């Protein structure tokens, strides 16, 4: 085959992926809302018909009216801000420590030998069961609540980051080394992209564990927070306020998870995962 013949050969045509139909995406969003809406409608109907006693489980409309009243007088906003502050501090402390130790254990042999064994032993202990000991160590004030959130967030991030680093194909690292990439470049272009999917999964699990820990922490000698609001309402049999607190926690967890998933999609644009059909 001559040179001109090669030059005139047409380039192979690579089919572009079919664009997703906006109408299909919109329809799927409506389907995702169908089951929660149906559940709320059934709950409202059962409460209004008397199948559910109001003192046991008030109607959603009653809970929303209570929420509007507490939001209007500033009560809900004050307690919500305190809960968000505790959750943010705990996530920052627990997540930062998990990132540092997970990276050390995943990247360094010495770090694996020194860090991973005690962490593996500590994860067998239910951190919520450590409340009596934590009260002795850090007191019964704000430190206890932040520590519980930090412990809840630490383990999911640590183990997913550790597993994400260890699951990277070593041949990719060797290929990068052969191409002349230094340690920092290999970390940036090979290790970090390979570990990010697992890290985002760990973040999503950590968010859930953090809110669960905060629910418990705010019921131990708290003076503010959504958990305190629920405990105070329980003393006066205000079931609507208790259910409102649970709803606030659920919405906070959902909003946090959606935020992490959005950041994951924006960060991992190169990753094509399996889509549900």
Question: Which ranges hold each PLM region?
Answer:
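Transmembrane alpha-helical segments of polytopic membrane transport and secretion proteins
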Residues: 1-37, 258-277
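Periplasmic/extracellular loop-to-transmembrane helix junction in inner-membrane transport proteins
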Residues: 19-25, 49-93
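Hydrophobic alpha-helical elements at and bordering transmembrane segments
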Residues: 76-80, 84, 114-122, 161, ...
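Transmembrane-helix boundary motif in ABC transporter permease subunits
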Residues: 89-119
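C-terminal transmembrane helix and the adjacent membrane-cytosol boundary/short C-terminal tail
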Residues: 109, 166, 201, 243-277
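Generic hydrophobic transmembrane alpha-helix motif, especially the helices
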Residues: 120-156, 163-164
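Transmembrane alpha-helices
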Residues: 147, 151, 183-217, 240, ...
């Amino acid at each position: 085959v001559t040179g001109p013949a090669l030059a005139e050969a047409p380039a192979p045509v690579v089919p572009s992926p079919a664009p997703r139909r906006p109408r299909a995406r919109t329809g799927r969003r409506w389907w995702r809302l169908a089951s929660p809406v149906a559940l709320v409608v059934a709950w409202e109907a059962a409460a209004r018909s008397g199948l559910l006693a109001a003192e046991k489980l008030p109607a959603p409309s009653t809970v929303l009216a209570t929420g509007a009243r507490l939001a209007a007088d500033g009560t809900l906003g004050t307690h919500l801000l305190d809960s968000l502050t505790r959750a943010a501090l705990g996530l920052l402390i627990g997540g930062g420590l998990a990132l540092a130790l997970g990276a050390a254990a995943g990247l360094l042999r010495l770090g694996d030998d020194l860090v991973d064994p005690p962490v593996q032993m500590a994860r067998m202990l239910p951190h919520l069961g450590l409340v009596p000991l934590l009260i002795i160590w850090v007191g019964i004030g704000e430190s206890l609540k932040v520590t519980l959130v930090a412990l809840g967030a630490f383990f999911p991030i640590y183990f997913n980051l550790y597993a994400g680093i260890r699951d990277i194909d070593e041949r990719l690292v060797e290929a990068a080394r052969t191409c002349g990439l230094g340690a920092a470049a290999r970390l940036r272009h090979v290790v970090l992209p390979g570990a990010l999917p697992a890290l985002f999964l760990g973040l999503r699990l950590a968010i859930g564990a953090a809110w669960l820990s905060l629910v418990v922490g705010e019921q131990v000698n708290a003076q503010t927070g959504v958990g305190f609001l629920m405990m105070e309402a329980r003393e006066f049999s205000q079931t609507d306020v208790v259910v409102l607190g649970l709803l606030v926690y659920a919405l906070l967890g959902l909003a946090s998870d959606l935020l992490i998933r959005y950041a994951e999609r924006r960060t991992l644009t190169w990753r094509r995962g399996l889509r549900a059909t």
